[in-house]
Amino acid sequence: MKEILLEYGEAEKIKVVPLWSASDDFKPICKEQNPFVKEHHLENKFVVMYSGNIGYTHSVECLIEVAKNMQTDNDVKFLMIGEGKKKTDLVAQAEELNLRNITFLPLQDFNVLPYSLASADLGIITLDENVSRVSVPSKTFNLMAVGVPLLAISNNDTEMFRLISKYQNGRCISKSNVDDIVAYIRELKSDKMLKQKYCNNSLLASKD
C-alpha cells in the first residue's frame, strides 16, 4: 500500500502500521482435537472455507460455480460462514443446483472462531476489485495464524497478491478462472508436501 500512496504523497508523511493477528487466540489445532470439526462432521473432509462478510465488497459468487464443478469430489466440503447482503441469493443458488457439498453457517462467536478457522484446509480471501488494490481482509491474518493455506480470489494488482507472493503461502486466482480454482483445490488436496509448505509459510507470515 505504501508504494501506491507514494504516487500521491511524500514518503515522510506516510506511516506503515504492521499487519496484525490475534495470535494469542488463534493457533493451529489438529482436526482430531477440534470440537468444531466434530460438531459439523468434517472428519475426513478437505474443507474449503470462506468465513466473513458475505456482502457487496466480497466476490464470493464464483464459489457456487466452483462447488458445482466439484460435486464428484466427495471428500471436498465447502463452508461459507457469515452473514451479508449476498447470502440469501447464494443459498438460493446452491439449493436450486442441489449442491450437497456446500454448507452455509451463521457468523460464529469469537470464542468459536479459532476452532472454525483452524478446521479449514484452504482459506478463501476476497475483496471487490475497487478496494482490493489497497486493502487486505483482516481475516487473512487470523487464517495465517492458524496455519491455513490461502486462496485469494483477486487480480494480480492487489495487496492480497503481493502478500501471497511475498510469503508463498497460497495462490491468487481471478474470479473468472473457475477452472483454475478447481485445479488448485484438487492439487492442494492431493499434494501433501505442497499443503504443508503453505501451512508452514502461513504460520511464519503471521509472526513476521
Residue positions per predicted region:
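Nucleotide-sugar-dependent
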Residues: H58, D109-A118, G123-M144, P149-R162
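Short acidic active-site motifs
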Residues: E32, K86-D89, N111-V112, E159, ...
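Nucleotide-activated donor-binding/catalytic signature segment of Leloir-type glycosyltransferases, i.e.
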Residues: D75-G82, K87-P114
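Conserved donor-binding loops in enzymes that form glycosidic bonds
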Residues: L19, Y50-G55, E83, P106-L107, ...
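A short, well-ordered alpha-helix in the C-terminal region of glycosyltransferases
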Residues: K45, D180-A183, E187, L194-D208
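Conserved donor-binding/catalytic core segment of Leloir-type glycosyltransferases
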Residues: S21, L42-H58, I64-A67, L79, ...
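Donor nucleotide-sugar binding/catalytic pocket of nucleotide-sugar-dependent glycosyltransferases
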Residues: M1-K31, L42-E43, F104
